[in-house]
């Protein structure tokens, strides 16, 4: 059975009005987030913004940061740095796995050579 778009956190399903109502924010605030490239939802064929659940969660985070007094440019930079940090953590995990394989290969070859 195939999954439905509603099951996909990245499916762009919600309009600006729906998201504004869900989060108790103004539609203009959501448009400003897009204009400042903080949260840029996909567009429908008619050009309307459509938000995924993942983007709605991100907007909630942005609302919290703005409530704490952060500017949109500061928030955009925070989001960029968090993305870079996640990528660095993934790369570290890859390198640690590679190091583990290399150590295992080295130990196996030492065992073979001592026989």
Predicted regions and their residues:
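Arg/Lys-rich, alpha-helical DNA-contact motif
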Residues: 2-12, 35, 40, 53-115
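Short alpha-helical "recognition helix" segments of helix-turn-helix
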Residues: 19-20, 75
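Append "Primarily bacterial transcriptional regulators
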Residues: 20, 33, 51
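Short coil turns linking two alpha-helices in DNA-binding domains
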Residues: 26-29
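Beta-hairpin "wing" of winged helix-turn-helix
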Residues: 40-46
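Minor-groove-contacting beta-hairpin "wing" of winged helix-turn-helix DNA-binding domains
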Residues: 47-53
